[in-house]
Amino acid sequence: RIGARKGYTAVSTNNSNLGTSRGVEALHESLDRSGDKVVFSGGNNKIFSGTALTDITPVGYTISANNWKIVDFNDHTYFFQRGHEPLLYTDHSGSGVLEAMSSHSHATGTPPQGNEVLAAFGRLWVADVTGNKHTVYWSDTLNGHAWTGGTTGSLDLTNVFPSGHDEIVALSAHNNFLVIFCKRSIIIYTGATSPANMTLHDT
């Protein structure tokens, strides 16, 4: 059943931070281990927290769009967007910090600057990178900021696409399957808990 409601109620209390932009274009609610809730939003080429729209954009970090895909994984919050170095939010010290992944003390390797990210099967999965829309990348086990060594890896789907060239647009996990949505096809892998051994299930 589809319903519609008239009007809207403003939640943010500091809309001046959005300037004359299109407003909030990305929104994500995060819940940490302590049960604390943080609402992240992206707009006006900035990243905000809370309804007061507190600007938490890392100093010196340049944002050119607000198409963030935001996921929670292992008590961290990750921000991905094509053409941007991924961002990482942690609250281990009791004071939340948003930083470029390369600035994080435990980060390793170079993460893909993908437009799609999925937290599933004990790791992060990323796809839709500028110049490469046919490869899925994955992080190390239980470590979304480790992109070299360990069980990190990637999968080139060039020879898997069932109807010629295609482009990955979204990733999902369902019934223990890794589902890869492309513009012209859907590709399903089984055994994604061990990516090095996962096999093609269906296209």
Residue spans for each PLM region:
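Recognizes the extracellular SEMA beta-propeller fold with strongest preference
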Residues: R1-T203
